[in-house]
Amino acid sequence: MHGRLKVKTSEEQAEAKRLEREQKLKLYQSATQAVFQKREAGELDESVLELTSQILGANPDFATLWNCRREVLQQLETQKSPEELAALVKAELGFLESCLRVNPKSYGTWHHRCWLLSRLPEPNWARELELCARFLEADERNFHCWDYRRFVAAQAAVAPAEELAFTDSLITRNFSNYSSWHYRSCLLPQLHPQPDSGPQGRLPENVLLRELELVQNAFFTDPNDQSAWFYHRWLLGRAEPHDVLCCLHVSREEACLSVCFSRPLIVGSKMGTLLLTVDEAPLSVEWRTPDGRNRPSHVWLCDLPAASLNDHLPQHTFRVIWTGSDTQKECVLLKGHQECWCRDSATDEQLFRCELSVEKSTVLQSELESCKELQELEPENKWCLLTIILLMRALDPLLYEKETLEYFSTLKAVDPMRAAYLDDLRSKFLVENSVLKMEYADVRVLHLAHKDLTVLCHLEQLLLVTHLDLSHNRLRALPPALAALRCLEVLQASDNVLENLDGVANLPRLRELLLCNNRLQQSAALQTLASCPRLVFLNLQGNSLCQEEGIRERLAEMLPSVSSILT
């Protein structure tokens, strides 16, 4: 044993580490206590900077101590000469950088650096950009550093083109850089603003095509990396329409005018207001939502005075102007007619996608073919499958309808954890297709039965629909947006899994409601139907509530205007 170095046992090592931790904790607590005592006594001097440096150098996430340092620095600003302050700031910046090396994702450290640079008369922004580049090279997904870089770029008025070039360099080095792709999505609309396109408006076509080529190179290089797929989806969504007034309807019998927007809005807010003229004369009216609540809505209504519906005159011309986007609709109510309307011509480009130029269509078609080839090589790549579906939607939703449904089945098998999301997305696309077919047929009846729907959408497009068939689906609820169907007379919703009827309210023309074989368990679920004044027929057969004792009497009392209730 002589001549050998004694090795500590595991118990001795554990005890040594315990004593070391206790010693560090004592120093930490004593330094913290000293800082708080000085702060309470108003002794905001350089000794506080020294004490907080000891603690923050090891644990940069002590927010209160950063506050103490700011208080001290503000105090010293009034006491130091410009030369002394410059030296102090230089030391503070160096200390902050050392803290960032300890924890590059420290909220307090990055915030303190922002605060410090904001107080300098002539900050060295070039140095800060270089600092960001170094930390992003170490961790390209450090969102704290990305936030700080955006702050620096804004303060230094760095041109968006320069920042875009910076993302180019990072993406070229590594395609799997979600933050760089995201930053591009922020910079491109700044670089290429399009008049009258809104915050979600389109990019110039040459830019869009260039970006599509770039991102295609990325996801073909690494098909399993999600960054490029997300960016590709963002590019496909770069053509959302701005706010428009898409439909105007006038009912003589109800003395009511209805308008429908492309998205939910509040009339009379900073977004804009509605101006109504009848026979070229301005008419002051009160606008309201179908449920009377002042919240964003696709549909807004107003009551019409009797004079504006005088049937002795040959016609009345109604014009509504939306000041938010300077769009208008006009319709003419003829003598002897009970209603009139005006709506946009409903092609698929105008309803659910933007019209494609020949060049863009060719590029997307090429991408679709390439993605199909990639899918053959990577049959379980969910991003590739989803992108194929989205490309088909962008190109021609009706032409690819059957093929799209087949890809949905494959995608659900590949990604069962997102089955509910995929069911809802599939339902959205099926509703869109059915609306398109209805519009092309120029009818007011919409058949959505036997489509395995899990959600309803685009109800704002159905203001003129009189008959809606939702039977034999998997709908758990009918959304409040159903109130947009101002002309609906017959609603078939049998053989679903409806648990309540909260969305079936304020439908002025609803006469027949079929709800067989759902999951309605209590009569209270039908209370909202009292807001449908013309409802005369209600079929509830096959629901649990039909087993309630005295259900018919309770329903007759709740819904006195309904003459026929089947239980």
Curated annotation (Swiss-Prot):
It comes from the Eukaryota. The modification Phosphoserine is found at S98. LRR repeats lie at residues 442-463, 464-486, 487-508, 509-530, 534-555. The enzymatic reaction requires the aid of a Rab escort protein (also called component A), such as CHM. Its EC number is 2.5.1.60. Pfam families: PPTA, RabGGT_insert. PFTA repeats lie at residues 44-78, 88-122, 124-158, 159-193, 207-241, 363-397. One of its GO terms (molecular function) is Rab geranylgeranyltransferase activity. It catalyses: geranylgeranyl diphosphate + L-cysteinyl-[protein] = S-geranylgeranyl-L-cysteinyl-[protein] + diphosphate. The keyword Repeat applies. It is an enzyme of class 2 (transferase). Disulfide bonds: none annotated. Keywords: Leucine-rich repeat, Phosphoprotein, Prenyltransferase, Repeat, Transferase. GO terms for cellular component: Rab-protein geranylgeranyltransferase complex. Gene3D superfamilies: Protein prenylyltransferase (1.25.40.120), Rab geranylgeranyltransferase alpha-subunit, insert domain (2.60.40.1130), Ribonuclease Inhibitor (3.80.10.10). The keyword Repeat applies. Heterotrimer composed of RABGGTA, RABGGTB and CHM; within this trimer, RABGGTA and RABGGTB form the catalytic component B, while CHM (component A) mediates peptide substrate binding. The Rab GGTase dimer (RGGT) interacts with CHM (component A) prior to Rab protein binding; the association is stabilized by geranylgeranyl pyrophosphate (GGpp). The CHM:RGGT:Rab complex is destabilized by GGpp. Interacts with non-phosphorylated form of RAB8A; phosphorylation of RAB8A at 'Thr-72' disrupts this interaction. Catalyzes the transfer of a geranylgeranyl moiety from geranylgeranyl diphosphate to both cysteines of Rab proteins with the C-terminal sequence -XXCC, -XCXC and -CCXX, such as RAB1A, RAB3A, RAB5A and RAB7A. It is linked to Defects in Rabggta are the cause of the gunmetal (gm) phenotype. Mice homozygous for gm have prolonged bleeding, thrombocytopenia and reduced platelet alpha- and delta-granule contents. Belongs to the protein prenyltransferase subunit alpha family. This is Geranylgeranyl transferase type-2 subunit alpha. It comes from Mus musculus.
